[in-house]
UniProtKB/Swiss-Prot annotation:
It is a single-pass membrane protein; Single-pass type I membrane protein. Interacts with CFAP47. Residues 877-986 form the MSP domain. Residues 1525-1550 form a coiled coil. InterPro entries: CFAP65, Ig-like_fold, Ig_CFAP65_10th, MSP_dom. Residues 1645-1667, 1736-1823 are annotated as: Disordered. This is Cilia- and flagella-associated protein 65. PANTHER family: CILIA- AND FLAGELLA-ASSOCIATED PROTEIN 65 (PTHR46127:SF1). It comes from the Eukaryota. Residues 1649-1661, 1739-1762 have a biased composition (Basic and acidic residues). The lineage of its organism: Eukaryota, Metazoa, Chordata, Craniata, Vertebrata. GO terms for biological process: flagellated sperm motility; sperm axoneme assembly.
Amino acid sequence: MFTLTGCRLVEKTQKVENPSVSFASSFPLIPLLLRGKSVQKKQAESKSQIKLHTQSAPFGLCPKDMMLTQAPSSVVRSRNSRNHTVNSGGSCLSASTVAIPAINDSSAAMSACSTISAQPASSMDTQMHSPKKQERVNKRVIWGIEVAEELHWKGWELGKETTRNLVLKNRSLKLQKMKYRPPKTKFFFTVIPQPIFLSPGITLTLPIVFRPLEAKEYMDQLWFEKAEGMFCVGLRATLPCHRLICRPPSLQLPMCAVGDTTEAFFCLDNVGDLPTFFTWEFSSPFQMLPATGLLEPGQASQIKVTFQPLTAVIYEVQATCWYGAGSRQRSSIQLQAVAKCAQLLVSIKHKCPEDQDAEGFQKLLYFGSVAVGCTSERQIRLHNPSAVNAPFRIEISPDELAEDQAFSCPTAHGIVLPGEKKCVSVFFHPKTLDTRTVDYCSIMPSGCASKTLLKVVGFCRGPAVSLQHYCVNFSWVNLGERSEQPLWIENQSDCTAHFQFAIDCLESVFTIRPAFGTLVGKARMTLHCAFQPTHPIICFRRVACLIHHQDPLFLDLMGTCHSDSTKPAILKPQHLTWYRTHLARGLTLYPPDILDAMLKEKKLAQDQNGALMIPIQDLEDMPAPQYPYIPPMTEFFFDGTSDITIFPPPISVEPVEVDFGACPGPEAPNPVPLCLMNHTKGKIMVVWTRRSDCPFWVTPESCDVPPLKSMAMRLHFQPPHPNCLYTVELEAFAIYKVLQSYSNIEEDCTMCPSWCLTVRARGHSYFAGFEHHIPQYSLDVPKLFPAVSSGEPTYRSLLLVNKDCKLLTFSLAPQRGSDVILRPTSGLVAPGAHQIILICTYPEGSSWKQHTFYLQCNASPQYLKEVSMYSREEPLQLKLDTHKSLYFKPTWVGCSSTSPFTFRNPSRLPLQFEWRVSEQHRKLLAVQPSRGLIQPNERLTLTWTFSPLEETKYLFQVGMWVWEAGLSPNANPAATTHYMLRLVGVGLTSSLSAKEKELAFGNVLVNSKQSRFLVLLNDGNCTLYYRLYLEQGSPEAVDNHPLALQLDRTEGSMPPRSQDTICLTACPKQRSQYSWTITYSLLSHRDNKAGEKQELCCVSLVAVYPLLSILDVSSMGSAEGITRKHLWRLFSLDLLNSYLERDPTPCELTYKVPTRHSMSQIPPVLTPLRLDFNFGAAPFKAPPSVVFLALKNSGVVSLDWAFLLPSDQRIDVELWAEQAELNSTELHQMRVQDNCLFSISPKAGSLSPGQEQMVELKYSHLFIGTDHLPVLFKVSHGREILLNFIGVTVKPEQKYVHFTSTTHQFIPIPIGDTLPPRQIYELYNGGSVPVTYEVQTDVLSQVQEKNFDHPIFCCLNPKGEIQPGSTARVLWIFSPIEAKTYTVDVPIHILGWNSALIHFQGVGYNPHMMGDTAPFHNISSWDNSSIHSRLVVPGQNVFLSQSHISLGNIPVQSKCSRLLFLNNISKNEEIAFSWQPSPLDFGEVSVSPMIGVVAPEETVPFVVTLRASVHASFYSADLVCKLYSQQLMRQYHKELQEWKDEKVRQEVEFTITDMKVKKRTCCTACEPARKYKTLPPIKNQQSVSRPASWKLQTPKEEVSWPCPQPPSPGMLCLGLTARAHATDYFLANFFSEFPCHFLHRELPKRKAPREESETSEEKSPNKWGPVSKQKKQLLVDILTTIIRGLLEDKNFHEAVDQSLVEQVPYFRQFWNEQSTKFMDQKNSLYLMPILPVPSSSWEDGKGKQPKEDRPEHYPGLGKKEEGEEEKGEEEEEELEEEEEEEEETEEEELGKEEIEEKEEERDEKEEKVSWAGIGPTPQPESQESMQWQWQQQLNVMVKEEQEQDEKEAIRRLPAFANLQEALLENMIQNILVEASRGEVVLTSRPRVIALPPFCVPRSLTPDTLLPTQQAEVLHPVVPLPTDLP
């Protein structure tokens, strides 16, 4: 045994428990197997590593080559799939080693054969002739034997034998015996077959030798035989082949975003025997690497799958790997991937107020104002809400030159993980001063997601440097003195400013310290200005202060120097002002003396400022010019030293810049000539200022220059030191000669400042070949010139910083042909100092032009730097996005539509634009804004508005003018650009409509909100703008009150072919029917007016309150004896229903739902409605009085109801907050609630419309006295009624009659009614003993006397007895004689108890005055409300289909029947029912059947019949039905029978008693139990005369052997009400209903002789008293004589005969013999051929019968009912009438021919008679015979008339009418019963099925007619009753 290593499974391998059995022990004939060949060497016994693969085995039952002789289901044992290792290289004598790892048992739960696979770790474990790689061996377990499915040989060689071992293992717990057959072919063989015996767990190795002879595949089978059947093992040898497999067979790639890439890997294994070349074939968007390759046997390659989708769909494709010879074999893998669109939400981090980040709008990222040259950073947030990675790219709109991009985003691309956020920085680095930069940043997710355009805006600000003063006046200074004044310079901006004054302080009389510097933001620096003149002269110099990134500032320095001999005029700032004015007017070229002379000669004049001007000769002359504003840059560059100047200079010097070059010495260089030229008309003196040690000087130092003359001078240079750099700016002042003496100035306005001349000279003293020192500097050079329009100069400032510790000289020289101007072009920069250089150019052309200049440092050519800048002339152009065409959508006439139009400014200048629409189109077209400013690189969207005037198509041409922004409003732009735009629009007409023309809210609860949606439709092709109006129709709207219907919006717009939804919210405030009309008008954008109103739809609503009603009431327990009618009054249900029908008051709606709102014991009452719920009275400790109320939601909305006790309305408070003292009322309520005297179940509920619910009210009689409890009955959002629960508990054996009220109202009776109805007044005995009542009728007599001795009130039974718990009916007759109200107070005495005075009240009315409003039948609302109710008690399984029957108004002596059903809803319980007889004081009520059984889930019909008496009266009865469970009754009868048997046994059994034994006095209950014990004797109970309702206060004698008691029955109560009217009054008021009622007349009953004698015996003594024998004998004699006389009297006999014969009616005198014959023949046609005796009297009688006497006019069920009964009766009558009509039609068709034949025969006879009359006179014999025939015919006719009279008399008999009514009633009952069972559908349409026609012989005889045809011809005759005479 050895341990397996190198396993791939996680589970630990198991050791083999049972060792293998040696093959030699079972098979001694091993040498036969070798067959003379050498035994193969045994494999080395080293422990080889074995790999266990986790590939699942196939789940098939058995391999195809396996055959079983028996059903495998009975013999194959299911086993788990395990992985085993088979050692096939060892000897046949060695035991096989098996590794059994633990694998999940569920992997092969459905497999009949276990699969086992194994694979060695390497091919080194196999023998020489074994395959290089062993395959997995699938094993199975069959009949307890574990064996491989097949043995597979691979890698074999021809002619060599290869052995594989077949391992069999016994997996069962019993000894296994089997046999096997050798393979059939000669290529596979094994040892000689012998029986195999395997013990449990033992393994057997069977060697199988394969010896091939040909290179082909071999297959065979090795069969095993067991007692259970046979099975086989496949033997297969295959050739080397190509085989590649993919693991796994399918590959699910991760979810990927569109445009992104994801990858996955799988293995491609070469499980074949040959090296295999493969090629992959796949489809987009999948890629596979490597796509081709070569795999050696056993080698695996990892394939990479790349997925890059282009659309968001689910991909499921198959990749195919082609391999093998000719690439004909293939292996495939299923690739599955899901592509989703990535989504990026862009937001701004750390938002500023100027930012815009709203959804649906342009996002704006505002950087604010950033200093030039600085960088600002803002961040945006990218959120990926999708489930995939979101790759993105960020692009900033590319400019034509990258150097001009002020915005940058280092994050050009990236990925945002699912659900995460990423922040991206955007930088703003402005380079152009005072410009607003706009750019657009596009954030583009990969794939199909839409990009987000982010607008970035920033403003570049520069320094804001200013001087304290712009003029420093030193006044006059003596020669040799020095004057100094302070001056501060300030930077008002927050960015750093570099400044420098353009003056050489060493060589100038004016000095500024410091001359250069740096100002940080918001800083100020003090400058020191000094004046030290060298000559007595007027000194004035305008010094420029150069500022980097700002226009230069100019500082005027002035001072006058006086000497002892020379005192020039003092220069003042006013002189400068006048000078500049004179410069603009051209007067500066004249010296002051000439100006004085001209002023004196009036050739010049002075203006209001004192400046000189040429006098104005004419008003039309132009005014004198003023000094213009000159931009600082222009003044700096064009100051007269160059070819271009603003004003001509008065004096100039050339050259202004001199370069001496290298002057190493020792000889001085040649001086450079200078030319000084005077352009004025006066003599000028020029003086050069020079310090003594300056290496540069000019000779002569001073000189005078005549007017318009020039002077030559020389510039000298003498470097004092070798190898040095020298640069200097020489200064000279030129002044008019006359100004040297102030006395020469007569007019101060002619004063003129001096002019300052400068010459910049440079040179160095470096020897040739000596290297100049290396400069260290930085040069801030922008790449682009600022944007300017055509013809305008553009300027830039450069900053040169000397970072070295030595001096730095520079010189700037533009490239040849370059048109840039540099100032200064040379200079000296001190160590650490900076030099500001200004550059100017005039751009030309719209394309970028490069400007190149060279910077040379330290006068060395090797330190030359080329600098390039670009400029262009900015074009005035815009880019239009719509290709100069714009289309409007179709627009409604009168309305407007808009269309956006976007254009972009590609230039770097802000442009002004203006749209110009012609005057005729301004009513149709409008644009907003029509003019405006568009910043550089900005996109601007305009809105065009199209307003058509008519239904047509429009075409417009509109122009847009563009010019440079920044011009004054009145200035005309120098250049403009013109664009034309084409606009197309269509005007249409349309209208709105509503999807529903009538919108009904239905029923809505008052004060509640309900919403409906109104769908508007726009079926047109244009957008409509509408406004809705709401008008209330009913009820009328009240001013200043909001409407009950609100619209969520009243205005809106609808696109074409669309619909819009308006939410309507209704909140009615009162109960009413609301109606509204919604109209609309279309809005016009032109004049902002609404069009004509048009109706849109109608809205209706019914505002209701919840409506609850009480349908029925029933009682149980102690209240069981109270009638339902009386109970209805006790609970004031009529008044309660009337209250519930009314609207609630506002106080009742204070709390719309049940709420705890009170802190007191008695909560406040918010309702004015109060009612009594009187539970009646019952004795102490009697069963509770239980009342069931049937509640119904009679409304149309759902409702919630609740009974709230005082405790339910009270807020729970702490004990310390409770009220300390309670009054008697509170204490009483607490006692009632704590003891639960009144209980309600359930206390609350919800009811849907039409739903009913039963509520149980219970009152427990636990305390003697009267109990009260206020209960609030609350209907949510409805009524709130206070119910006063009242209950009375009576002491035992106390008399008590419960009077509900002291007043009683009789039913109103019409006056003149001779037979007023009987009315009922009920008295209920609530005590436990019988009571006797007595009505005192004396007061009734008094009322009678007052009313003309007419009995207004009459009590029919003024005295009677009331049993405990029952109700007595006191009958009254109220008979008014006047239309008024009668009242009487009648005392009712309860004998032995109290008396009560009852106030009776009756109303008499005149029926002729009231008409139809006369209340003929108004018992109570219980009469109608409970007709269709069904009050179901909890636990009740049987119920009535109707709990109340209201017959309404009926005539007296009528019989009314109703069919009802008894339903058993139980599924397994049979119920027996028994109706209790309910006797009435008048009339009769019966139920049929009285008893019966209702099967489970069955229905039993029964009929309730009321037979009204002859008296007009009110009927009110409660019919009680007792219900018994059949199962309990059987048990009861069984126990009763056992009890009777035991009773009989005890009666025959006797006991011998030992008299000597003392009577036991101890308790028998303590005796020990004995096996047998004689039962005590049964004693007869004494009849109890006490009431049965008495409780257990009276001890009862214990029954020795109690008799089983029957089970307590369930009770069902059926109420019946009716009002019987006298026949005359019923006909007068209900004439149309009279035929619907059947008048039941009782038949005279014949008594038996015995009964008659008994009756006579009973009545005679009471009526006559005792009679003597003499009187009896006398009476007999007298009567005998009289009777004998009558028998002998003939006159008496004749009189009797005449009285029996009916008198001849008056119409008999019109008798005609011929008509009689004709009628006789006509009536006998139908019956004579069939019946032997003519009986046409039946038909005659039927035809003469009055309509009201026919059977169909006496329906058995009385008045037609509602519902199914009424429909059933009507349809049954229709069916009967149709059948009768069909029968009559058939009879007419059958007898038609016969009638025609009879008529022809009769006509022939008549003709014969007439002809006979004309002929000769007959003989007397013929006349006698004719007379005899006539006599016979007359006798027949008389006989027929007598029979007809008899039939008519029979029909008028009550018995016949009763029989007809019984038959019809039975038929209708059968139909309704069948309909209730579903056998007949009464509501279906009637169908008439015509019978097939048949031929009837012309002559009908009884023999020719079949029996069925006879039945069709004859009418059925109703049999008569047998009791008729």
